[in-house]
C-alpha cells in the first residue's frame, strides 16, 4: 500500500512538474510573441460613426482578413480641435501596444513625437484620406524620422475625370444637335488645391472627350465660376452667372455647391429646368435631388470610394510589414452614382446621407 502511495506521489509530482513546464513555456511564448503578435494593424481615422468611416472600416477589415491580419479601428467623436487629444491618445495606445503597422488620418497637428516613436520602433505608417498634416510631415522629414511609407487617398483630378466621362455621355447628343454654342458651366467651390484639382480634372477630361468626337468637336464652350467659399450664397450667385451665360450643363465641384444650387432651383420655379447638372460627393440633398422626377435633372455625381481607401491603406501597410513592394502613392478614382444605383450605393456606404 505504501509502495503504491509512493508511486502515485511520484506520478503526481511528475505530472505537476510537466504541467508547470508547459505553463511557463506558454507564458514565455506570450511574452516573446504570441500568435497574434506581428499581425495587428491599428487604423486611426478622423471619425468612426459616420457612414464614410464605416465604409473605410469595412475595406480595412476585408484587406486584413485577406492577408491574415487583424485590425483595431478607432476615431474621435468629431474632426474638431476639441477631440484632437482623444485622437492623440488613440495613436499613443497603438504605439504602446507595439502594433505591426499604423494607418492614420489626423485631425490636427502635434503628432511628431508619436510618429518619431513609430520610426524608432520600425512601425510603418500609411496615411490615408486627408492624411497627416503637412507641418508634422515637414518636421519629421527635417529630423529624418518620417515613418510614412505610403499615402492612399481620392485623386480629385481622377474622380472629376470620372464625372466628366459620365456627364459627357449624357449630354453628348445635346451638344451634337445644338447650334454650335453649347455652354458647359463649372462651379469651383474654392481656390484650394482640392477645388483647383476637381475643376481642372473635369475640364481637362471633358475637353479630351468632346474634342475627340467629331459630332461634338468645336460645338461647345466651357464657362467657369470660381468662388472663395460658400459664404454669402456664393454658389447661388455662380449659378445665376452661368445661367446668364447660357449654360445648358453645369458641374458642381463639392457637396456645398450642390446644396446651395439645389436650394436655388427649388425657389426658382421652372427657371433652371433646361439645365442638366452633375455633382461631387454625396449628402441628403444630393440624394433627394437624384431621386427627383421633376425639375432640373441631376444626372449623377462622383463619390469618394471610401471602401477602396480603407482596403488599399491596409494592403500597403501589410506590404510594408512584410518587406514587399509598397506603392508610395495610391490614388483612388472615385465611384459614379446616379438614380439607377443610389440605393445600392447607400447600402454599401459609398454614398452617405447627412
Regions found by a protein language model. Name each.
Residues 114-158, 283-295:
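Flexible loop/hinge segments that line or gate small-molecule binding clefts
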Residues 52-67, 159-163, 194-215, 260, ...:
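Short, solvent-exposed amphipathic alpha-helices that sit
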Residues 87, 149-182, 232-235, 258, ...:
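Hydrophobic alpha-helical segments within soluble ligand-binding/sensing domains
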Residues 92, 104-121, 125, 202, ...:
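Hydrophobic alpha-helical
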Residues 40-67, 72-88, 99, 105-109, ...:
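Extracytoplasmic "Venus flytrap"
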Residues 1-40, 65-66, 70, 95-96, ...:
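Short, low-complexity disordered leader/linker segments with a strong preference
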Residues 65-82, 183, 206-232:
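Short beta-strand elements in bilobed, periplasmic/extracellular small-molecule ligand-binding domains
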Residues 180-189, 194-195, 206, 305-354:
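Hinge/cleft segment of the Venus flytrap/periplasmic-binding protein
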Amino acid at each position: 500500500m505504501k509502495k503504491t502511495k509512493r508511486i502515485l506521489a511520484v506520478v503526481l509530482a511528475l505530472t505537476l512538474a510537466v504541467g508547470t513546464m508547459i505553463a511557463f513555456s506558454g507564458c514565455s511564448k506570450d511574452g516573446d510573441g504570441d500568435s497574434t503578435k506581428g499581425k495587428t494593424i491599428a487604423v486611426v481615422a478622423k471619425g468612426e460613426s459616420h457612414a464614410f468611416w464605416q465604409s473605410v472600416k469595412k475595406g480595412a477589415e476585408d484587406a486584413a482578413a485577406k492577408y491574415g491580419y487583424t485590425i483595431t479601428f478607432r476615431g474621435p467623436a468629431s474632426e474638431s480641435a476639441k477631440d484632437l487629444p482623444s485622437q492623440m491618445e488613440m495613436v499613443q495606445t497603438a504605439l504602446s501596444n507595439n502594433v505591426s503597422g499604423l494607418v492614420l488620418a489626423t485631425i490636427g497637428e502635434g503628432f511628431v513625437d508619436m510618429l518619431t516613436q513609430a520610426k524608432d520602433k520600425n512601425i510603418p505608417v500609411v496615411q490615408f484620406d486627408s492624411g497627416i498634416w503637412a507641418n508634422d510631415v515637414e518636421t519629421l522629414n527635417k529630423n529624418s524620422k518620417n515613418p510614412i511609407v505610403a499615402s492612399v487617398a481620392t485623386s480629385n483630378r481622377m474622380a472629376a475625370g470620372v464625372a466628366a466621362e459620365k456627364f459627357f455621355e449624357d449630354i453628348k447628343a445635346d451638344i451634337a444637335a445644338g447650334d454650335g454654342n453649347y455652354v458647359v458651366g463649372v462651379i469651383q467651390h474654392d481656390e484650394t488645391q482640392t477645388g483647383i484639382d476637381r475643376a481642372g480634372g473635369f475640364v481637362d477630361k471633358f475637353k479630351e472627350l468632346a474634342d475627340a468626337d467629331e459630332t461634338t468637336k468645336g460645338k461647345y464652350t466651357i464657362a467657369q465660376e470660381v468662388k472663395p467659399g460658400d459664404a454669402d450664397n456664393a454658389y447661388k450667385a455662380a449659378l445665376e452667372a452661368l445661367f446668364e451665360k447660357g449654360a445648358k450643363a453645369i458641374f458642381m465641384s463639392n457637396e456645398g455647391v450642390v446644396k446651395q444650387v439645389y436650394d436655388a432651383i427649388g425657389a426658382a420655379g421652372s427657371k433652371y429646368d433646361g439645365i442638366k447638372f452633375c455633382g461631387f460627393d454625396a449628402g441628403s440633398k444630393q440624394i433627394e435631388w437624384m431621386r427627383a422626377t421633376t425639375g432640373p435633372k441631376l444626372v449623377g455625381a462622383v463619390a469618394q470610394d471610401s471602401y477602396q481607401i480603407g482596403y488599399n491603406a491596409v494592403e500597403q501597410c501589410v506590404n510594408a510589414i512584410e518587406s514587399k513592394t509598397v506603392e508610395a502613392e495610391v490614388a483612388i478614382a472615385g465611384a459614379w452614382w446616379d438614380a439607377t444605383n443610389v440605393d445600392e450605393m447607400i447600402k454599401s456606404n459609398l454614398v452617405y446621407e447627412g
